[in-house]
Amino acid sequence: MSETIRVATRSSRLAIIQTREVIELLERESPRDVEVEIVKTKSRGDVVRDRPLHKLGEKGVFVKEVDRLVLEGKADIAVHSAKDVPSVVDYPVDVAAVPPRRDPRECLVSRHGGLKELPRGATVGTSSPRRRAQILLERPDLKVEPMRGNVDTRVSKVRRREYDAAVLAKVGLDRLGMTSEVSEVYDPEEFVPPAGQGALMITCRKDDDRVKRLLEVVDDEKSRVEVETEKAVVRELGVGCSEPVGVHVRARDGDHVRLVLGLFEEDGSCGHVLKMRGSPEDVVREAVSQAREVLSDG
C-alpha cells in the first residue's frame, strides 16, 4: 500500500537539495511505497535581502511561510534547516523527525587562506552577530561587514573581490557540491556554531498522527537529542539569532552528552566558552546557570 505525502520547502537550490535528501531517506527507509509531491514557497527571509536577519524584527523568517502551507492543508510536512527553526514556535506544529545530522561546523571561504593568514584590515562578510563576535575576538584588526544572500551569492562575492573572506556553514557548501571553496574549517568547540547547525527538522501538524508514524523511520535519536538540547539552552536563555551566542552538543553513549556554549560581545571585546558533560537535562541546567552568572557579571 502506498502513501502520498506533500512536502513544503523554500524554493532555493539548497532548500530543494535538503528536501530531496529527506525524500530519498524516506523512500529508502519506509516499509511502504511513498509518493511525494514538492510544494515550493518563498519565505520572508528569502524576499527581504537588504537587512541583516536579526534586524527584520521577527523570529523564524525562513520558517513561517513554509509551515503555513502545512497549517493550511496545502502540504503534509515541511523541511527546514534546524538552525532556522526558533526555539519557541507559537503555532500548532510538531517536529516529527530530525534525520541524521551532517557537519555542524563553521568554515571560511577566503582568497587568502585561513583566518590567521588574512591581511591586516581585510574584509570578512557575515551578518551574524555570533560570527562577527568570534571573528573579531580572534582578529580584532579585521573589518566585518554585513553579507546577505544564498550560499552561491556569498561565495561569488568573495570570488569577485567584494570581500576578502566569508564565514559560512560547511554543510551548505557540502550539499551544493562546493566543498572545494572551503579554505578553513573550525572545530565547534573553538568557533561555536548556532543551535541546530548541520541538522534538518521536519515539521507537521500537531494532530497529524498518520504523518508522524510515517516519519518515525527517518527520525535519528542521537541527532534529535543533540538538537533538542541545543534548542533548550537558547530557549531557557531567551536568546535568538540577534544575540552573539553559540551552542553545540555532541551526544555520546547512552544519555551522556558534551555541551559547548559560547557567549560573546559582538564587538569581539570579550568571549566566554563554557564546556560541560552529563545528561541532556543536567547540562542544560548547568549551562543556563553558568551563562546567567557570566551575563550578570557583565
Curated annotation (Swiss-Prot):
- Classify the source by domain of life: Archaea
Residues with S-(dipyrrolylmethanemethyl)cysteine modification: C241
Name its pathway: Porphyrin-containing compound metabolism; protoporphyrin-IX biosynthesis; coproporphyrinogen-III from 5-aminolevulinate: step 2/4
The protein's UniProt keywords, in alphabetical order, are: Porphyrin biosynthesis, Transferase
Return the InterPro entries for the record: HemC (IPR000860), Porphobilin_deaminase_N (IPR022417), Porphobilinogen_deaminase_C (IPR022418), Porphobilinogen_deaminase_C_sf (IPR036803)
What is one term from the GO cellular component aspect held by the record?
Answer: cytoplasm
Q: What class of enzyme is it?
A: transferase
- Enumerate the catalysed reactions: 4 porphobilinogen + H2O = hydroxymethylbilane + 4 NH4(+)
One Gene Ontology term of the molecular function aspect: hydroxymethylbilane synthase activity
* Cofactor names: dipyrromethane
Gene Ontology biological-process entries: protoporphyrinogen IX biosynthetic process
The free-text cofactor remark is: Binds 1 dipyrromethane group covalently.
- Give EC number(s), comma-separated: 2.5.1.61
User: What is this protein's function per UniProt?
Assistant: Tetrapolymerization of the monopyrrole PBG into the hydroxymethylbilane pre-uroporphyrinogen in several discrete steps.
Q: What else is known?
A: The porphobilinogen subunits are added to the dipyrromethane group.
Q: Which HAMAP family does the entry link to?
A: Porphobil_deam (MF_00260)
Q: Which PANTHER family match?
A: PORPHOBILINOGEN DEAMINASE
Per the record, the similarity remark reads:
Belongs to the HMBS family.
Its recorded name reads Probable porphobilinogen deaminase
Question: Which organism is this protein's natural source?
Answer: Methanopyrus kandleri (strain AV19 / DSM 6324 / JCM 9639 / NBRC 100938)
The gene it comes from is hemC
